[in-house]
Amino acid sequence: MFKNISRILSVVALLSLVLAACAPAATATTAPAAPVTQAPVAPATSAPATVAATTAPVATTGAAPAAAGGWCSNVKIVFFPGGTPGGGFEQVVYNGAVQAAKDTGANVQYVWSDWDPAKMTTQFQQAAATKPDGIAIMGHPGDTAFDPLIDAAEGQGIIVTSMNTQVPLAQAKYAANGFGYAGAILYNAGYALGQEAVKESGLKAGDKAFLWGLKAQAGRGERTKGVQDALEKAGLKVIYQEIDDATNANASAGVPVFTGIMSAHPEIKMVITDHGNLTGTIQTFLQAAGKKPGDIFAAGFDISGNAVTAIQGGWLQLVIDQQQYLQGYFGVLQICLTKVYHFGGLQIDTGAGFVNKSNLDALVPLIKAQER
């Protein structure tokens, strides 16, 4: 299915070029941020680490396979999937990028960052030093840390675009140069999940919810803030815990933190995990805390194979779907469109809606293929 979509996107891009030759130049605009309301539904090396498989990553010394002689075949891209090879969320981002590379012929190299903002900025500098045509980043470090580095890269003629987490000041500054965004609008997505979780759980004012997130991260923390605002507006009492570095890189490291919170607050009725890999580990967390399916209303971000199992088993009740495959696909495509056709940056909101037990079945084959 996604191969067909990608071919269509390439054709649309070519048609757009032809139409552009016959029409006045248009000014790039960004889509208005709106809450997700429809319910259909983070080790690096000193040099870019590259991977060639589409579902089971294996380290290689070259870029992922690309279409020989494709329309973007002379374009060199460094791509940041975010976390670690094989991670439930970032592997799907990677698969989308690999498919885009195959469809366009782009020469793409992949850099894994353990979801560590400091590592991302260091790796960005290393990537820029190789003078690629473009770099597709995860925006977790935020404008303050990233913008001076982006300024330097743009000054060298390197196209930069972001995925998953916006870098809004840099995006506004360099939109005409191809700086786009593919991902959810973070605060709105967080607020929407919090609001939907309250609705589906039936919790009332005064009930306690445990929110495990990344509020301290510039930019990325907006999603956690959105969740908290929605819960507090509904009158829930929020017990908040920042995700530590070890758990951010490896979700299973968070078991002692989770059990400690649940032991200290046995009256908790809801858990929301603002991290795809933590959401996929919710069954492990709850079992370690001595809970049974349905004892706690659990919600979180990002559908994955583990999340599917947790939903089917009654451990996880609600997930907001970022459609992260598209984040990877459009990250590569944006740079190709800008380099080859001089298109400006596109803003693409991939946060489509919610997944729960009622609508899961249709997505299961795609999730198992790591395309959703």
Give names to the regions the model predicted.
Residues 16-21:
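C-terminal motif of bacterial Sec signal peptides marking the signal peptidase cleavage site
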Residues 23-372:
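A residue-level marker of the well-folded mature domains of exported/periplasmic proteins
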